Amino acid sequence: MRVTDFSFELPESLIAHYPMPERSSCRLLSLDGPTGALTHGTFTDLLDKLNPGDLLVFNNTRVIPARLFGRKASGGKIEVLVERMLDEKRILAHIRASKAPKPGAELLLGDDESINATMTARHGALFEVEFNDDRSVLDILNSIGHIPLPPYIDRPDEDADRELYQTVYSEKPGAVAAPTAGLHFDEPLLEKLRAKGVEMAFVTLHVGAGTFQPVRVDTIEDHIMHSEYAEVPQDVVEAVLAAKARGNRVIAVGTTSVRSLESAAQAAKNDLIEPFFDDTQIFIYPGFQYKVVDALVTNFHLPESTLIMLVSAFAGYQHTMNAYKAAVEEKYRFFSYGDAMFITYNPQAINERVGE
């Protein structure tokens, strides 16, 4: 399969730079996987699309202020983007500088360059950095870090982004990007879903900066997926198995929830799904056999991204590309702060030929 098969024209004006005033007031494009039928509505219509006993699976990761500015002690300006917190003192990070720092280099971080750190080792494209400070990494980031808005939101981060770029149920700090499908859920909508009898469970996948890396190969099968840490605890496994047993659907909120659940299913030895606490490099593209997820809530993704490939594997390539074409024509808002889709699984997607 060619990466260009997943390209589409997107006017710049449809990229959302700010969220809607109310989280659940965005538009919702519903795609019926088996037929390809499209329905236009608003996000709160989700209430009518879910049945009592259906299971919503959310990702409860919390975005950390992962972008740091400063300079090398030798003088050159640097920008640090945290990929992962290794422990209380160390991070793994991308560093942008005119000349990459060498192991042992001293870094002065923060807008006032008040935080001292040392680049201790290099691991491929990533740098290991140790803070010379009494505070924990998380405390330091909360003090001097900026919210790492995606590159396509072409503006500096603002104080409001510290809450707007978080889900209302975010709990475990560690992500460099928000699981954006979850941004549309507010407390009133969650309360109505609970009142209807919709079940809820929470996985954790700490979204890494790799999620914004373009696919740099021509053929999809040659792409090496970035690694991210995911947790699917026992209570989620039990909720999934119970939903399946009673004939209800498992509905993933966001592609990160999909990747967590399907990673746990891939690793399972004795059951459909088993607890999972590990890094995952799962790459879902057409031909992938879904085992757990029956429906998906997701935002609109970038052309030629691994995420539009994941959606194509779920709903079918042609149905997905037709839906995106309709979304552009109807002027839906795209990407992290944009509108959403509700998609049901197309069991025939696995047999579809792409790009022929």
Curated annotation (Swiss-Prot):
Its EC number is 2.4.99.17. One of its GO terms (cellular component) is cytoplasm. It is found in: Cytoplasm. The keyword Lipid metabolism does not apply. It catalyses: 7-aminomethyl-7-carbaguanosine(34) in tRNA + S-adenosyl-L-methionine = epoxyqueuosine(34) in tRNA + adenine + L-methionine + 2 H(+). Transmembrane segments: none annotated. One of its GO terms (biological process) is tRNA wobble guanine modification. InterPro entries: QueA, QueA_dom1, QueA_dom2, QueA_sf. Signal peptide: none annotated. Keywords: Cytoplasm, Queuosine biosynthesis, S-adenosyl-L-methionine, Transferase. It comes from the Bacteria. Pathway: tRNA modification; tRNA-queuosine biosynthesis. Its main location: cytoplasm. It is an enzyme of class 2 (transferase). The keyword Nucleotide-binding does not apply. GO terms for molecular function: S-adenosylmethionine:tRNA ribosyltransferase-isomerase activity. Transfers and isomerizes the ribose moiety from AdoMet to the 7-aminomethyl group of 7-deazaguanine (preQ1-tRNA) to give epoxyqueuosine (oQ-tRNA). Belongs to the QueA family. Monomer. This is S-adenosylmethionine:tRNA ribosyltransferase-isomerase. It comes from Escherichia coli O1:K1 / APEC. The gene is queA.
